[in-house]
């Protein structure tokens, strides 16, 4: 009891001087703006909005950013919302009118006490937001319904993304099935965030809600120069980390050691976190496609497979490599390694304008079958990358430069 009381007194003695301070003065416009960035720049994100508006003849386009996190985790924005705004702050909404070209950014009202805990947050009172983002109309989130009432009196269509919301380490091919399983659960049954939004819009405003995802996916599939640069930087960070992991491999260390090493190198090289969980499989664990435990010690006769990549400026990379723990290949290891390397080379050779992802898949599979390894093909050999590690895009669509 005495120890507990003493601990409380110490905590209070540390806290009281802070509590006695006057509220911190509001940051100046210059200093607040200096702490913020707008994704890949206002020109990039503004260009994405303009292109999307040019693909729609009429109606409103509504996109909601993610709310605050439920846990003590760093906030990460929904990929689609970030693509269109560059805003990495919770509680934001984007509304656009295809007919007039009007673009409105809605942000939460100022909450100074919250900023004392979490630092500068974007809100409707920040004078620098418009200059930084390119938005000429920034309004409080509390006015969203009022503006929707005004605009839906003139148009009866609202376009939204029904693509499952994903933030860091998220992919549509995981998020979509998760939402469907939860909706089908008889003891849960919750609709996805996107479905709930569609239902609310229909009920409140009597509008037709249409998906805009086809247009968004076409845009996201073909990368701009800014996106290619971000992906190259992510790839470089991932490659440096992979080389460090290979150099550090030896019998007796844990899979967790390579996991931690790569995560550290990713961040040292500018990454903001993992594009997906680390897959560090040694020995028998290397055969588990999405192994995540990282709990085994490496042994001298093992091959180790490492599949890990960072996210950098919201763009991902995906690198997989295998090597012997001892540093020397056995004849069988070399045979398998060479087969995979040959399949990879065939796949790269099949990548060309006008070709498809399906063509690349067939080229890789053909080599493996010729090497007698056809029965081991359990998954695809390639996929799009970009904002999501498994990025959007139809595999039958012709590839473009």
Where are these regions (language model features)?
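Active-site neighborhoods and metal-handling regions in enzymes and metal-associated proteins
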Residues: 3-5, 18-401
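Bacterial N-terminal signal peptides
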Residues: 7-17
